[in-house]
Amino acid sequence: MASLRDIKAKINSTKKTSQITKAMEMVSASKLNRAEQNAKSFVPYMEKIQEVVASIAQGSKGINHPMLNARPVKRTGYIVITSDRGLAGGYNSNVLRTVSNVIRERHNMDSNQYSIIVLGRLGRDYLKRRGFNIIDEVVGLSDHPSFTDIKDLASRAIAMFADGAYDELYIYYNHYVSKISQEVTENKILPLTDVASDKPTTAYEFEPSEEEILKVLLPQYAESLVYGALLDGKASEHAARMTAMKSATDNAMEVIDSLTLSFNRARQAAITQEITEIVGGAAALE
């Protein structure tokens, strides 16, 4: 049985750990509130640009643009959004496991059939260790990234599609459902074959021409899909870390309660033993 000193040391150590996890939970909760606002505030912009693109696509059937046209798929590109830091429950492992399984099933790990663009240090390290074909990466993004932080990568991804480096582009990330629920999501970024909206489209007059507008607008729309997924993923990351730290804090408190009970029992046993020895000694003197 552990000594009173050992039990007391474990209690103090666990209390310090619980203080750290509690602080991390509070920090993550604060970051989550801002990340939620960032993700929500970007949605109207993304919806409006989709509306304009849909209006052009539906109103001008003769327009031919490479980003709108499907082509035979010989190679597929994947954008994978993960985090730079851990301690976020299954946030990274869920999306990485999904992507790994998809690539094994669809491409049998043949690097000539796929390529990966990865965001986040943990995702990069995981995929590199397992021999996946990574062609671009971004690490060190802030907890609240701006569009500028991701624009270069998104532009490169779109340019590679236009240059024929791959024939379709998917993005994988954790979609934020609620503070306790996030789900791995796959979205097709390119080609933009489903830009049509179910909502009634507004009639626009375009100057100089619809074709010229699309040349500018389509890359911006594709970039907005990447950025929107990143904001969504960041909200999921903070939510997952907050939940993980709360669970760790709760577990630590349970351990402290159990150790405190063991400490009290051990101390009671020690006191009982001392009393027994005193009584026994007194009886021997009589």
Swiss-Prot record:
Pfam family, one: ATP-synt
SUPFAM superfamilies (UniProt xref): ATP synthase (F1-ATPase), gamma subunit (SSF52943)
Cell membrane recorded as keyword: yes
Keywords: ATP synthesis, Cell membrane, CF(1), Hydrogen ion transport, Ion transport, Membrane, Transport
Subcellular location: Cell membrane
InterPro entries: ATP_synth_F1_ATPase_gsu, ATP_synth_F1_gsu, ATP_synth_F1_gsu_CS
Top-level division of the source organism's lineage: Bacteria
GO biological process: proton motive force-driven ATP synthesis; proton motive force-driven plasma membrane ATP synthesis
PROSITE patterns (UniProt xref): ATPASE_GAMMA
Membrane topology, as annotated: Peripheral membrane protein
Molecular function terms from GO: ATP binding; proton-transporting ATP synthase activity, rotational mechanism
GO cellular component, as recorded: plasma membrane; proton-transporting ATP synthase complex
HAMAP family: ATP_synth_gamma_bact
Family under the similarity heading: Belongs to the ATPase gamma chain family.
Function noted in UniProt: Produces ATP from ADP in the presence of a proton gradient across the membrane. The gamma chain is believed to be important in regulating ATPase activity and the flow of protons through the CF(0) complex.
Subunit structure: F-type ATPases have 2 components, CF(1) - the catalytic core - and CF(0) - the membrane proton channel. CF(1) has five subunits: alpha(3), beta(3), gamma(1), delta(1), epsilon(1). CF(0) has three main subunits: a, b and c.
Protein name: ATP synthase gamma chain
